[in-house]
Swiss-Prot record:
PANTHER family per the UniProt record, alphabetical: HOLLIDAY JUNCTION BRANCH MIGRATION COMPLEX SUBUNIT RUVB, PTHR42848
Compartments where located: Cytoplasm
Protein name per its UniProtKB record: Holliday junction branch migration complex subunit RuvB
Molecular functions (GO terms): ATP binding; ATP hydrolysis activity; four-way junction DNA binding; four-way junction helicase activity
Gene Ontology CC annotation, any one: cytoplasm
Sequence segments annotated as region (Large ATPase domain (RuvB-L)): 13-201
Annotated region described as Head domain (RuvB-H), given as residue ranges: 276-352
Gene name of this polypeptide: ruvB
Subunit annotation: Homohexamer. Forms an RuvA(8)-RuvB(12)-Holliday junction (HJ) complex. HJ DNA is sandwiched between 2 RuvA tetramers; dsDNA enters through RuvA and exits via RuvB. An RuvB hexamer assembles on each DNA strand where it exits the tetramer. Each RuvB hexamer is contacted by two RuvA subunits (via domain III) on 2 adjacent RuvB subunits; this complex drives branch migration. In the full resolvosome a probable DNA-RuvA(4)-RuvB(12)-RuvC(2) complex forms which resolves the HJ.
Assigned protein family: Belongs to the RuvB family.
Annotated positions binding DNA: 330, 335
Species in which this protein is naturally found: Prochlorococcus marinus (strain AS9601)
Small ATPAse domain (RuvB-S) as annotated region, ranges: 202-273
Pfam families xref list: AAA_lid_4, RuvB_C, RuvB_N
C-alpha cells in the first residue's frame, strides 16, 4: 500500500516518501524471515499450485535428465515478481535430489565473485541467480564457457605478463530468474536450454493458496471471503498472502476475532486504502493524473515527474496490473486511460 499524507489534495500528485505497498509484488525482509511463509512453500512440484503447463514441461525435462544421468539443462524463469521463481528453483533442485545454491546478481559485483560461486559447486548441483538481468558484462562473459563447456577461461596477470588458464568445473545447472527478459543479452539468453514464463495465477489457484495458508496459521476463513481476497491479489501469491496477514492483524487487534468474513475483509482493506479492485492510493493517483489530461497520451517520464515518482517503478510495478485489468493502454505516443479506467476513476473519491 502506498502511504500518502492526508494533506495531499485532490489535485496534488507530489508524493512524499512511501512505505511498503501491500499490493507491491516485490519481496521484503519481513517476508524472507517469516517462518510461516517458509513452511507454506510446497515440498515438490506436485504440491505447487498453478502453472500447470510450466510444471508439465519441467517434469519431462527433469525426468529426462535423471534417466540420462545428466544435469538438467540451464533454465531461465521469467515473469512478474512474486509468482514463485525462487520457489520453483528450490523445487527443481529437490526433484533432482541435489542442493540449490542461491545468489542475487546485484551481489555479484566482481568477476571473482562468480568465480568463487562456480568453484564452490559440486557435481549436479543447482546454482540459482536471481535478477540475472543485472549481471555486469565481465561477470556475464565468464558464464558463457561455464554454461556451455563447464569450464572457466581466466586471464591471469596483465599486459605482456598475461596468461590464460582454464579450470574445469563440475557439471551443474544454472537457473536464472528475471522480471526483465528483454534486458538479458542475447548471448546469455541463448545459452539457456529451457526458458519458461511464469504466468499470473487464476482466482481459483490463489484461493487454494490462501486457504492452505490460513489453515497453517490457524485462521478461520470463510469460503466466500477467501475468494474475495483472491480476486484482489493481482494474480500474485505473494500479494495474496501479504493481504491475508494484514487482514488477520486487523481481525485480531481491531475486531477481536479469529474468523475472517467478507464484511471484515472489506473493513480491513478499507483501513489500508485498498478497494474492491485491489487498487491502492498510488494506483488511483496514477489514474487520476491521466484522467486530468482529457484523453491525451502522456509519456512515462512526464507522468513520473507529475507524480514525483520513479519512472521505472511506475512502468514495472504500477502499470502491468492496470493494463491487465483493462484500465490503461500503452501507445507509441504515451499512456492512455481506457474507457473502463475512466469510468472507474470517475466513480472514486480521491480521498477514498
Amino acid at each position: 500500500m502506498a502511504i500518502i499524507s492526508s494533506n495531499i489534495g485532490d489535485n496534488d500528485f507530489s508524493f512524499r516518501k512511501k512505505e511498503l505497498r501491500l499490493v507491491d509484488s516485490k519481496n521484503i525482509p519481513e517476508e524472507k524471515r517469516n517462518n510461516n511463509l517458509n513452511l507454506a512453500r510446497p515440498l515438490n512440484l506436485k504440491e505447487f499450485i498453478g502453472q500447470e503447463q510450466l510444471k508439465s514441461s519441467l517434469r519431462v525435462a527433469i525426468d529426462a535428465s535423471i534417466i540420462r544421468k545428466e544435469p538438467l539443462e540451464h533454465t531461465l524463469l521469467y515473469g512478474q515478481p512474486g509468482l514463485g521463481k525462487t520457489t520453483l528453483a528450490f523445487l527443481i533442485a529437490h526433484e533432482l535430489n541435489t542442493k540449490c545454491r542461491i545468489a542475487t546478481a546485484p551481489a555479484i559485483e566482481r568477476p571473482r565473485d562468480i568465480v568463487g560461486l562456480l568453484l564452490g559447486l559440486k557435481e549436479g548441483e543447482v546454482l540459482f541467480i536471481d535478477e540475472i538481468h543485472r549481471l555486469n558484462r565481465l561477470t556475464e562473459e565468464l558464464l558463457y564457457s561455464a554454461m556451455e563447456d563447464f569450464r572457466l577461461d581466466l586471464t591471469m596477470g596483465a599486459n605482456r605478463g598475461a596468461r590464460c588458464r582454464t579450470i574445469n568445473l563440475p557439471r551443474f545447472t544454472l537457473i536464472g530468474a528475471t522480471t526483465k527478459l528483454a534486458s538479458i543479452s542475447a548471448p546469455l539468453r541463448d545459452r539457456f536450454g529451457i526458458s519458461q514464463k511464469i504466468e499470473f495465477y487464476t482466482c481459483d489457484e490463489l484461493k487454494q493458496i490462501i486457504v492452505n495458508f490460513s489453515r497453517l496459521i490457524n485462521l478461520n476463513l470463510e469460503d466466500e471471503a477467501s475468494y474475495d481476497l483472491a480476486k484482489i491479489s493481482r494474480g500474485t501469491p505473494r500479494i495474496a498472502l501479504r493481504l491475508l496477514r494484514r487482514v488477520r492483524d486487523y481481525a485480531q487487534v481491531v475486531m477481536k476475532t479469529n474468523t475472517i468474513s467478507v464484511n471484515l475483509i472489506k473493513k480491513a482493506l478499507n483501513s489500508y486504502q485498498i478497494d474492491e479492485k485491489g487498487l491502492d492510493s498510488l494506483d488511483r493517483h496514477y489514474l487520476s493524473f491521466l484522467n486530468q489530461n482529457n484523453n491525451i497520451p502522456i509519456g512515462l517520464d512526464s507522468i513520473a515527474s507529475g507524480l514525483g515518482d520513479d519512472s521505472s517503478m511506475l512502468e514495472f510495478v504500477v502499470e502491468p496490473y492496470l493494463i491487465k485489468i483493462g484500465f490503461l493502454t500503452r501507445t507509441p505516443r504515451g499512456r492512455l486511460l481506457t474507457a473502463l479506467g475512466k469510468k472507474y476513476i470517475d466513480s472514486k473519491d480521491d480521498n477514498f
